[in-house]
Swiss-Prot record:
GO terms for cellular component: cytoplasm. This is Phosphate acetyltransferase. InterPro entries: P_Ac_Bu_trans, P_AcTrfase, P_AcTrfase_dom1, P_AcTrfase_dom2, Phos_Acetyltrans/Butyryltrans, PTA_PTB. The gene is pta. It catalyses: acetyl-CoA + phosphate = acetyl phosphate + CoA. It comes from Thermoanaerobacterium thermosaccharolyticum (strain ATCC 7956 / DSM 571 / NCIMB 9385 / NCA 3814 / NCTC 13789 / WDCM 00135 / 2032). Pathway: Metabolic intermediate biosynthesis; acetyl-CoA biosynthesis; acetyl-CoA from acetate: step 2/2.
Length: 328
C-alpha cells in the first residue's frame, strides 16, 4: 500500500468535515466528487450554489454541503466574531463584514468555530491569500513557535529514504528561517513523520557543507539549528550539517560523515531556506516523477492547507485526505 493510500484509509476510518472555499473551481469539484464517492471526508463547498452546480455538471457532489457566505445565517456571527478577534488591530465592524465575504476568511471562521475540522484552498489563490486569514483566525497551535510546511514525497523506484518516501520541509512558508526557527521546523517535521506517516524519523539538516567541510555563516546557522533541535528532542535521530548526497547515499555518508545516526539513511530532509526547499521539491517532483503531496502546514491551531496553483485534481484529493487525518 502506498503512503497516500494508507493516509486515505486512515481518513476513512474517522471521517472529518473539510471546507473548500474554492467551491466552483473545476479541479476542486472533480476532487470533491472522488472524496465523497470514496468516503474520505465530508465536504463543505463555499460559493454561489448555482455556479457550483453548473460547474459540477457531470459530477456527483450531492453529498456535499453548499454554503454561500453572502446568504449564510452564519454570516453576521462570523463577522462579529472576526471583529472581536481583530478590533485591537484597528478593524471596524463594517470592515469585518466586508472581509468575511471572502470565502477563505469565511472558511477559516468555520474552522475556528468548530463547524469544520479543516480547510483546503489555493488552486486559484496565492499562498499569502490563505495564510493571512489562517494566521489571523485559526492562529498557531498552543506551544508552537512557528508555522511551517512540508511535502510528502513518494519517489518511484527509489532506494533512499523510507522505501522512496520522504518528508521535505520547509518548502512553502518561511523564506529565511533563523537557527531557532529552523530547529522548530525540524522538530515539527520529526513529529509529523511519526504521527502522520508512521515513520521513525531520521532528520538531516541540509547544507552545502558536511561536518565542517566548508566555513560560512549559512553553515553556522544550520549547525546551530541542529544542536538546538537535538536538545529539544534528544530521542530522535537528527544530524547536520549534511550535504544531500551524504544524507542519502550510504557510501558517501561513510566517507563524509562516519558514525552519523542519520547520514546515508535520512527520511526527513530539512532545507536551510525556502529557496532551497521550493526548488528541491520541484526538482524531485518533475525529474524523478515523484508524487508530491502538499504543501501541508504544521503548527496551526487546526489544519489549514494550501495547494499549488499547478495542482491536479488528484493532488487536491491527496491534500484533503491528509488534512482530514491531521484533524483526527
Amino acid at each position: 500500500m502506498s503512503i497516500i493510500q494508507s493516509i486515505i484509509e486512515k481518513a476513512k476510518s474517522n471521517k472529518k468535515k473539510i471546507v473548500l472555499p474554492e467551491g466552483a473551481e473545476p479541479r476542486t469539484l472533480k476532487a470533491a466528487d472522488i472524496v465523497l464517492k470514496e468516503g474520505i471526508a465530508d465536504l463543505v463547498l463555499l460559493g454561489n450554489a448555482d455556479e457550483i452546480r453548473n460547474a459540477a455538471e457531470g459530477l456527483d457532489i450531492s453529498k456535499a454541503e453548499i454554503i454561500d457566505p453572502l446568504k449564510s445565517e452564519k454570516f453576521d456571527k462570523y463577522a462579529t466574531d472576526f471583529y472581536e478577534l481583530r478590533k485591537n488591530k484597528g478593524i471596524t465592524l463594517e470592515k469585518a463584514k466586508e472581509t468575511i465575504k471572502d470565502n477563505i476568511y469565511f472558511g477559516c471562521m468555520m474552522v475556528k468555530e468548530g463547524y469544520a475540522d479543516g480547510l483546503v484552498s489555493g488552486a486559484i489563490h496565492a499562498t499569502a491569500d490563505l495564510l493571512r486569514p489562517a494566521f489571523q483566525i485559526v492562529k498557531t497551535a498552543p506551544g508552537a513557535k512557528i508555522v511551517s510546511s512540508f511535502f510528502i514525497m513518494e519517489v518511484p523506484n527509489c532506494e533512499f529514504g523510507e522505501n522512496g518516501v520522504f518528508l521535505f520541509a520547509d518548502c512553502a512558508v518561511n523564506p529565511s528561517p533563523n537557527a531557532e526557527e529552523l530547529a522548530s521546523i525540524a522538530v515539527q517535521s520529526a513529529n509529523t513523520a511519526k504521527t502522520l506517516l508512521g515513520m521513525e524519523p531520521r532528520v538531516a539538516m541540509l547544507s552545502f557543507s558536511t561536518k565542517g567541510s566548508a566555513s560560512h555563516e549559512l553553515v553556522d546557522k544550520v549547525r546551530t539549528a541542529t544542536e538546538i533541535a537535538k536538545n529539544l528532542i534528544p530521542d530522535v535521530a537528527i544530524d547536520g550539517e549534511l550535504q544531500l548526497d551524504a544524507a542519502l547515499v550510504k557510501e558517501v555518508a561513510e566517507l563524509k560523515a562516519p558514525g552519523s545516526p542519520v547520514a546515508g539513511r535520512a527520511n526527513v530532509l530539512i532545507f536551510p531556506d525556502l529557496q532551497a526547499g521550493n526548488i528541491g521539491y520541484k526538482l524531485v517532483q518533475r525529474l524523478a516523477k515523484a508524487n508530491a503531496i502538499g504543501p501541508i502546514t504544521q503548527g496551526m491551531g487546526a489544519p489549514v492547507n494550501d495547494l499549488s496553483r499547478g495542482c491536479s485534481y488528484k493532488d487536491i484529493v491527496d491534500v484533503i485526505a491528509t488534512t482530514a487525518v491531521q484533524a483526527q
